[in-house]
Amino acid sequence: MRKLLIVGGSILVVCLVLGLLTLRFIGYEPRDGSTGFWLTGAVVTTPVTDWSFTEAVEEIFVETRTWYYIPHSVNTYCTIYNDKLYLFSAYYQGGEFPDNRYWNRNVLRDPRVRLKIGNQLFERTVSHVTDEAEREAVHQTFVEKYTEWHTPGLETVHMFRVLP
């Protein structure tokens, strides 16, 4: 019986490792409100000084780093303010920041992210925006870009600035 448990457990571990390796190479992106793991695409290594191409993009993918080393990815909105790219996280049903958004907890712990815009991957660092004047201005650009969007109010909206 002990030998059967060891063999069965070993097979389970091998299957799990093979599954994770497969996901690592083929990726598993977020879909229809569900989260994903690794993002795939062409990595852009040159600095980006003009993010204006994102104005035509509704949603982007954000891959964050978890404490257990398996990436966590989500889709989110983005906008530009003063030539900088910003990411958006709204707490529509309330909840405490960052506890109700796993990706928010991840980027506060480790701000390195991968952004997928189209088929391109951008490895960047983000910074949580806390300055009220900047938050108000960025929030206004979100409202102008996403005209169908109904804001839950600035107090439940959180923004992250993408650093160069």
Predicted regions, residues:
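Hydrophobic membrane-insertion alpha-helices, especially the h-region
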Residues: 6-24
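Short beta-strand segments
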Residues: 57-95, 125
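Short, conserved active-site entrance elements at the starts or edges of catalytic domains
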Residues: 24-71
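Generic structural hydrophobic/aromatic packing signal, biased to beta-strands
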Residues: 13, 62, 87, 115, ...
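Positively charged n-region of N-terminal signal peptides that target proteins for export
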Residues: 1-4
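Short, structured beta-strand-loop surface elements
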Residues: 28, 37, 92-164
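Generic low-polarity alpha-helical segments
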Residues: 8, 72-76, 155, 160-162
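Charged, low-complexity, helix/coiled-coil-prone segments
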Residues: 19-21, 41-53, 75-89
